[in-house]
UniProtKB/Swiss-Prot annotation:
Belongs to the CarA family. Small subunit of the glutamine-dependent carbamoyl phosphate synthetase (CPSase). CPSase catalyzes the formation of carbamoyl phosphate from the ammonia moiety of glutamine, carbonate, and phosphate donated by ATP, constituting the first step of the biosynthetic pathway leading to arginine and/or urea. The small subunit (glutamine amidotransferase) binds and cleaves glutamine to supply the large subunit with the substrate ammonia. The gene is carA. The active site is at C237 (nucleophile), H322, E324. HAMAP family: CPSase_S_chain. L-glutamine binds at S44, G210, G212, L238, Q241, N279, Y282. The lineage of its organism: Bacteria, Bacillati, Bacillota, Bacilli, Bacillales. Pfam families: CPSase_sm_chain (PF00988), GATase (PF00117). This is Carbamoyl phosphate synthase arginine-specific small chain. Residues 1-162 are annotated as: CPSase. Composed of two chains; the small (or glutamine) chain promotes the hydrolysis of glutamine to ammonia, which is used by the large (or ammonia) chain to synthesize carbamoyl phosphate. Tetramer of heterodimers (alpha,beta)4. Keywords: Amino-acid biosynthesis, Arginine biosynthesis, ATP-binding, Glutamine amidotransferase, Ligase, Nucleotide-binding. One of its GO terms (biological process) is glutamine metabolic process. GO terms for cellular component: carbamoyl-phosphate synthase complex; cytoplasm. It comes from Bacillus subtilis (strain 168).
């Protein structure tokens, strides 16, 4: 069936549509050659139409273990070519079969290069995937999409000797797995219930990734600041942005975001450059950072945006990139080790009211 990707400025791109005939969302692009299974199920992509830049997607199928959440989070997938005949010993579905199972539209044979050039030149915009480009209606994401992506109840993984509370704004499974692999017990706490950490009394806090505008979490910034002032904290992606906001900083939206597995980041402390996996639309405004409390630890090599912070007095650190990768390079996994070895030991006694 013929289908279209229609952008909010009226530009349309034709292709072949498989699945549900109509959906709307924010059109973004991912530049990685692999990792489509993790991308499709990453809660940070909640409500978005993902355009894959690599021309062939699905060649190794979909397996049962590399999901980042229990179901696809994207509104639709747009590719140049979807591979129907996958080749991998662990695969159980083709890309098309998996998306059909969840009624997620797949638009193929699209000139994805032209789509990306359009978004890159004009910025991220709302879009619809539809069987008819006439009269297409475009509805953007709700203001607080993290509310839809976070868990509804507290859960626990692992039984290690270090107890980490993972505050969930739409966390990736691989973040919890990375901590469990390092000997941690991980308790996932929905951000709406974050005050539960005072009863849990963990050794440390991790503020997770998540979708959408960090300012949509503004009503919780006071609680976030109180918690991270009492517990050693690591913020990842959205969690990093929330730490900056909690200490009086500001964030803004990039024209087309960082989404891929080859983003170079420099550590200002060691002068080392390493490749990172990233997925975000918003960044911290460097000019807004309170230099009396926070210092910039990492910068993006290409656009010099802020990629990580450290508190000057409290055991608090943050990164804009994804140290757990999945998908992407494992060069920054040491962030978890640094947090557990150097930040956690600085734990202060919880101040009881």
């Amino acid at each position: 069936m013929e289908g279209y990707l229609v952008l909010e400025d009226g530009t349309s791109f034709s292709g072949e549509l498989d699945g549900h005939e109509n959906c709307t969302g924010e059109a973004v692009f991912f530049t990685g050659m692999t990792g489509y299974q993790e991308v499709l199920t990453d809660p940070s992509y909640k409500g978005q139409i993902i355009v894959f830049t690599y021309p062939l997607i699905g060649n190794y199928g979909i397996n049962e273990k590399d999901f980042e959440s229990k179901k696809p989070q994207v509104k639709a997938a747009v590719v140049y070519e979807a591979c129907d005949h996958f080749s991998h010993y662990e695969a159980v579905y083709s890309l098309k079969e998996y998306l059909q199972k969840w009624n997620i539209p797949l638009l193929t044979h699209v000139d994805t290069r032209a789509v990306v050039k359009k978004i890159r030149a004009n910025g991220t915009m709302g879009a619809t995937v539809t069987a008819s480009k006439e009269g297409a209606e475009i509805a953007l994401q709700p203001e607080n999409v993290a509310e839809q992506a976070s868990a509804q109840e507290i859960s626990t993984f692992g039984d290690g000797n270090k107890h980490i509370a993972l505050i969930d704004f739409g966390y990736k499974k691989s973040i919890a797995s990375s901590l469990v692999k390092r000997g941690c017990k991980v308790t996932v706490v929905p951000y709406q219930q974050m005050e539960a950490v005072y009863n849990i009394k963990p050794d440390g806090i991790v503020l997770s990734n998540g979708p959408g505008d960090p300012k949509a979490i503004q009503p919780y910034l006071g609680k976030i600041k109180s918690i991270i002032s009492r517990f050693p904290t690591l913020g990842i992606c959205l969690g990093h942005q929330l730490i900056a906001l909690a200490f009086g900083g500001n964030t803004f939206k990039l024209p087309f975001g960082h989404r891929g597995a080859n983003h170079p980041v420099i550590d200002r402390k060691t002068k080392r450059v390493f490749m990172t996996s990233q997925n975000h639309s918003y960044v911290v405004d460097e000019q807004s950072i309170n230099e009396e409390e926070l210092t910039i630890r990492f910068h993006h090599v290409n656009d010099t945006s802020v990629e990580g912070l450290a508190h000057k007095k409290l055991p608090v650190m943050s990164v804009q990139f994804h140290p757990e990768a999945h998908p992407g390079p494992a060069e920054s996994e040491w962030i978890f080790d640094d947090y557990l070895k150097n930040v956690i030991p600085a734990r202060r006694e919880i101040a009881h009211a």
